[in-house]
Amino acid sequence: PAPAPHGVVVKVMANGVCRSDWHGWMGHDPDIQLPHVPGHELSGVVEAVGKDVTKWRIGDRVTVPFVGGCGICPECHTGNHQVCDAQFQPGFTHWGSFAEYVGIHYADVNLVALPDTLTFDTAASLGCRFVTSFRAVVDQGRVSAGQWVAVHGCGGVGLSAIMIASAAGANVVAVDISEQALALARQLGAVATVNANQVADVVEAVVEITQGGAHVSLDALGHPTTCFNSISNLRKRGKHVQVGLMLADHSTPAVPMSKVIANELEILGSHGMQAHRYGAMLAMIQSGKLAPEKLIG
């Protein structure tokens, strides 16, 4: 492709695949119009630069959030590019990175420079699951040391959240139906695990482990059951963060609203992360507090 005046073309060096891609090729995403090129977890090198781009040069090593902002709408003006009114999503609203080259719009707003010490493979793995989890745990959940955090679903997003919450000093309880996933969760910092297929009541199990309920709980899977359990296992005034996508038949889950009201619970969404927040995450990676390469399979 040729770069837009405000965009760049990136030579793709590495890609990731995630559940959002699955939703796309299953037809759950109305933004996708065929023919289409998916791919939104990417890293690479700037190959061409649009005439209005000021911050980037050919040869720069870069990655990009999977939700990009236009830089001029009201949400972007408040720094919330991840909910931009005219958001750009490679692989969804536009052709993506499952190709040799990909066009990235609004480059001065959305591109992220990669440290020389970060490999392209690791950088691509940050693109969706890790940055999504970082924002969910750090910015939305506001997790702090000593808190109890429950993570429902130990796929890529959930395991990333476990690593990040543990690095923040939280006590993490991981919930899944796979013993293999739960074993990996323990390796990444979970202090307790719950196999949802082996307990009578997931909510009771988490409340017992946390001695009253989690301060913060994440549904990292995106299913009516995990959403309900995540809200229900909170202690009073706790925070539920919905990270896993809930599309198609799962888009209108039951919510224990009486408990939300009586216990003053917070229900928060989390949708990607802005390019300007990558610095905090990359600093933790470079210091050794986070090791996303452990999640590459």
What are these regions (language model features)?
Residues 203, 207, 211, 248-297:
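C-terminal substrate-binding/catalytic core of Rossmann-like NAD(P)-dependent dehydrogenases/reductases
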Residues 55, 70-152:
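NAD(P)H dinucleotide-binding glycine-rich loop of Rossmann-like/cofactor-binding domains
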Residues 238-239:
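Glycine-centered, small-residue-biased loops immediately flanking beta-strands
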Residues 243-244:
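Acidic carboxylate diad motif detector
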Residues 63, 215-218:
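N-terminal Rossmann-like NAD(P) cofactor-binding module of classical short-chain dehydrogenase/reductase
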Residues 234-235:
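Helix-to-beta-strand junctions that scaffold the AdoMet/dcAdoMet cofactor pocket
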Residues 61-62, 116-199, 204-205:
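Mid-domain Rossmann-like dinucleotide-binding core that forms the NAD(H)/NADP(H) cofactor-binding site
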Residues 1-15, 28-74, 115-117:
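Glycine-rich beta-strand-centered segment in the early N-terminal region that forms part
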